[in-house]
Amino acid sequence: MISFWLIFLWLFVVLVLLFVVSLLYKTFSRKEKKLTFLSLPDEIVLNCLARISRSYYPKLSLVCKTFRTLLISNELTVARVQLKTYESFFHVCLKFPDKPNPSMFTLWIKPGQILTNQLEKNERSTGATRLVQIPSSYCSIVPHYLISVGSEVYGLSQHNDPSSNMFVRNKEDLFWCNAPNMTVARAKAIGHAYNGKLYVMGGCRDDESVNWGEVFDPKTQTWEALPDPGSELRFSSIRKIDVFQEKLYVSSNEKIDSVYDPKEGKWNVAEKSPVQCMNLGCGMIEIANYGGKLLILWDKVGLSQDKDIWCAVIALEKRDGVDEVWGKIEWASIVLTVPSSYVFLYSLLNRI
């Protein structure tokens, strides 16, 4: 009988010791919980992200799903507006022979880098300035094609998938609203405002060529088809639309430009100038206003029959007593190397 109680007591002591050892093991082996960036409240994370250059956003979106969600949220846009951390971004759309859909690139400039004029030094790019493709995981930042009509801004989707959607917002507002849909779905359409109306062209399928171009009237909120410009323009790649002498000039990658007269409702053709013809081969691609400075994009035959796309930013100055504008090259470098058969489609400048 005594041996039974001794055994029972021995087992009890063993169990108690095992319990104590287990408790001590859990206590000492448990790692101290570290405070991570993502453990902070979203408001603080958004405030931090809003102070970072958007140049880092595409790479940050690859870190984790939480970052990706925050980076494409409207709350981040609101935070940037409140902090006034606006940035101007230059985008280009290129078409490559081995890809079915056009690719969107944005000009990336490494923050804190001293940029130089590599034209003078005849050097290759240091990588401080590049045209970086917008990754599919970050496709929500693919910019709208923006057209201002009066106090409103209209946006056309620049995604590869055709869409008839159009968006509108007041210039003082942050968020987009749905506008009346276009009559056909378009992929990367081009638009321009003239006489209080919005003209949209291109980006539709061959069987929808009747509505290749259409005009939107904000007053009546209705769309109206434009006359057929002819197969040469319909099957070409449109670069941009300009207004000159009350007519719309449609620039393409062909040897001629098309001109539309809204008053007569007729299309005509116009020969390209020698400068414009340089766009068809090796030469100037685009000129844009980049934050009050002149941005020039051009290509040049590089190694292995590829082409190097160069970019230069020029600061302009009008000197006293001289009726001339002087320019100083702030920096120039190769920003992208592409196949020689690539096609430049268009450029966009966003301030976000």
Curated annotation (Swiss-Prot):
Any single Pfam family the record assigns to this protein: F-box
Keywords attached to this Swiss-Prot or TrEMBL record, sorted alphabetically, are: Kelch repeat, Repeat
Query: Which parts of the sequence belong to the F-box domain?
Result: 34-81
Q: Which PROSITE patterns match?
A: FBOX (PS50181)
Q: Where are the Kelch repeats?
A: 145-196, 197-243, 245-287
Top-rank taxon, per record? Eukaryota
Classification via Gene3D superfamilies: Kelch-type beta propeller
Protein name as annotated: Putative F-box/kelch-repeat protein At5g28180
The organism is Arabidopsis thaliana
